[in-house]
UniProtKB/Swiss-Prot annotation:
This is Large ribosomal subunit protein bL19. It comes from Francisella philomiragia subsp. philomiragia (strain ATCC 25017 / CCUG 19701 / FSC 153 / O#319-036). GO terms for cellular component: cytosolic large ribosomal subunit. Keywords: Ribonucleoprotein, Ribosomal protein. PANTHER family: LARGE RIBOSOMAL SUBUNIT PROTEIN BL19M, RIBOSOMAL PROTEIN L19. One of its GO terms (biological process) is translation. GO terms for molecular function: structural constituent of ribosome. InterPro entries: Ribosomal_bL19 (IPR001857), Ribosomal_bL19_CS (IPR018257), Ribosomal_bL19_sf (IPR038657), Translation_prot_SH3-like_sf (IPR008991). SUPFAM superfamilies: Translation proteins SH3-like domain. Gene3D superfamilies: 2.30.30.790. Belongs to the bacterial ribosomal protein bL19 family. This protein is located at the 30S-50S ribosomal subunit interface and may play a role in the structure and function of the aminoacyl-tRNA binding site.
């Protein structure tokens, strides 16, 4: 059981401007990157490998292919470093965690699109 003060602080920090997405969906995450004294937005485009719903501590992992190598990055859903999330394609998958996609290449790595 959490303290009421902790719940109040967590509730105020939860973001409501982010779209709903599920594992398998192709998304673009725009996040703020700080390099020295400059700030810019960098896009990370891939599909959602897993999603963890834990209130303020929610997180999701996005996987993309970069120069033939698989790159995975885990984001905190309610992080202030995330500028925006856009859903490119919705997927029709039957699993909550798509870890099996790590070992697939080529046509086998395709995900069926939801119509």
């Amino acid at each position: 059981m959490k303290n009421k003060f902790v719940e109040l602080v967590e509730k105020s920090q939860i973001r409501t401007d982010l779209p709903e997405f599920n594992p398998g969906d192709s998304i673009t995450v725009n996040l703020w990157i700080k390099e020295g004294d400059k700030q810019r937005i960098q896009a990370f485009k891939g599909f959602v490998l897993r999603k963890r719903n834990r209130g303020l501590h929610s997180a999701f992992t996005v996987r993309k292919m970069s120069s033939g190598m698989g790159v995975e990055r885990t984001f905190q859903t309610h992080s202030p470093l995330i500028d925006s999330i856009t859903v490119e394609k919705r997927a029709d998958v039957r699993r909550a965690k798509l870890y099996y996609m790590r070992g697939l290449t080529g046509k086998a790595a395709r995900i069926k699109e939801k119509v």
